[in-house]
Amino acid sequence: MSTPDAQPDPEVYEQGRGMDAHNEVMREIRGRRDRTYDPREPTRVWLDEDNTPDGVYQSLTIILNTGGCRWARAGGCTMCGYVAESVEGGSVSHEDLMTQIDVCLEHEAENADEESGLIKIYTSGSFLDEREVPAETRRAIAETFADRDRMVVESLPDFVDRGKVRDFTAHGLACDVAVGLETATDRVRHDCVNKYFDFTDFEAACDEVRAVAEADDADAGVKAYLLLKPAFLSESEAVEDMVSSVRRCAAVDGCHTVSMNPTNVQRHTMVEDLFHDGGYRPPWLWSVCDVLERTADADAIVVSDPVGSGSERGAHNCGDCDEFVQTAVKDFDLRQDPSVFEEVSCECETTWAAVMEREKSYGMPLTR
C-alpha cells in the first residue's frame, strides 16, 4: 500500500497528463484505509436482471478482488473506492482468482433457481489488464462460463484488443466489453473524475470489438458506463453532460448499451472528503429520470443502476418517494418505456427543479 509520500510507479500513466495535484490528494486519501482483504474472497457478488441486445437475462455479477487498478496506484478516480478494497501487494494468484470464481458459483447455486444466462465480471480496475488478471485466468474464466449465453467484462480502453475478446467469442459466448468512460466530455473526465484517457480512446476500443464481430461473425459489442454528477459539477451541469454523453456514445458504431449511473459516496475517495465537508451531494433521483426520459430515443439501450439509492450516500430525493422512483427506473431499464416516469410524482420535484435552476458549481450543494 502506498503512503502519502510514495512516488507513483511511472508506468501507471501519471506523468505528463497534468493530473499530479489530483493524484497526490488521492494517494493521501487512499493511504487511510484500515482493512485488509482475503485474496480468496470476491469483493462483491449478486444476482439481478439485466437488459441486453438479446433481451432480459438473469445476471450473476462478480467483482473480483485483484491487486488493484493500475491507474489508482498513481491516485486514480475521484469517486472510486474499490481500489481501497483490493488485496495489498499488487497481485492475486491465478489459483486465488479461480477460488473467487468458485465462491461466486456457490452463491449462485444457493440463491438462484437456475443458472444465469448473463455473467458480468468486474475488478477494481480492468479485467483485461493482464497485470490484474493474467491471460491464463482470463481464458480459464471464459471456459468456466462457456455454457452461458453472454458475458460482460470491464476494462479501460487501453487493454481492449481483438485477441482478448476472442477468448470469449471462441466459446460461442456473446461478449460485451464494458468501458468506464464516465462522460463523453474530455475536460469533465480529466478534471472532475481524474481519468486520463480521451473519448477517441473509447472510440478506438469500440473499433477493436467491432472488428471481431465483423471478421468472425461474432456477437461482440461495447457497453459504455457513464457517471452522473462527478465532483465539482452542479446538478444541472451534470444532467446536461449526461444527456450529451448518452447521445455521443449511442452514435459510436459498436456501442449498443449505455449505462448511466449516479455517483455514490464510497469510502477513501475525494468525493467522500467533499461529502463530509459539505461540498458534495449525490444526484437527485429526479435527475436520473430526467436523463433517461430525454435520451429514450437514442440508438442504444440506455439503463441506470443507482447503487445506494435512497440513502444519504446514494442518489436520493426527499426520502418519501425514493423507493417508488427507483422502481420506475428499474422498470424503464427492462422495458425502455419512458412513460413509466409519468406514474411517479412527489412534492420534492419542485425542490429539485429549483436546484436545477439555481445551483451553481461554486456554491453547491443547495440541498442535502
Feature names for model-found ranges:
Residues 91-107, 133-141, 197-204, 238-246, ...:
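Well-ordered, non-membrane alpha-helical segments in soluble/globular domains
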Residues 105-113, 141-146, 164-174, 207-219, ...:
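Acidic (Asp/Glu)-rich catalytic clusters
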Residues 81-100, 104-133, 144-160, 174-202, ...:
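Core AdoMet radical
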Residues 131-139, 161-170, 236:
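Distinct, well-ordered alpha-helical segments
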Residues 40-99:
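Canonical Radical SAM [4Fe-4S] cluster-binding loop centered on the CxxxCxxC motif
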Residues 125-127, 157-159, 183-185, 228-232, ...:
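Active-site-proximal loop/turn and secondary-structure-junction residues that shape catalytic pockets
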Residues 200-269, 286-306:
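Conserved C-terminal portion of the radical SAM core fold
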Residues 1-31, 250-252, 257-259, 263-368:
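Auxiliary Fe-S-binding modules of radical SAM enzymes
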